[in-house]
Amino acid sequence: MKETDIAGILTSTHTIALVGASDKPDRPSYRVMKYLLDQGYHVIPVSPKVAGKTLLGQKGYGTLADVPEKVDMVDVFRNSEAAWGVAQEAIAIGAKTLWMQLGVINEQAAVLARDAGLNVVMDRCPAIEIPRLGLAK
């Protein structure tokens, strides 16, 4: 994927469902969620562990299907094997982008999502890409 494509995704995205969210401040998903919130994104934590709880001021949900609002991007903080199921859920809720974090690599999930019309970013972190592309606020 070209850098201009990634920049376009990041500038057109408003609502991000962060799948695999953790309420532990030392976890990468917590730190990235905080960064994305600080950048002005609306971030929805998704994980059975945060369902019904508030994380960084945002209500948590157990699954993507439980999220009651439109999601632009699904950011995957799960292992590579779990990405296939998350891709299926992202398609089902009508997300525009499936973003698999650093170390999350699943070509089958990427093909599935692309074939369904989603943008796919794999093995990258938005908290790294935003400042690298000069998009930080």
Swiss-Prot record:
Cited SMART domains: CoA_binding
GO cellular component: a single term: cytosol
Coiled-coil blocks: none
InterPro entries associated with the record: CoA-bd, NAD(P)-bd_dom_sf
Official protein name in the record: Uncharacterized protein YccU
Species assigned in the record: Escherichia coli (strain K12)
Gene field: yccU
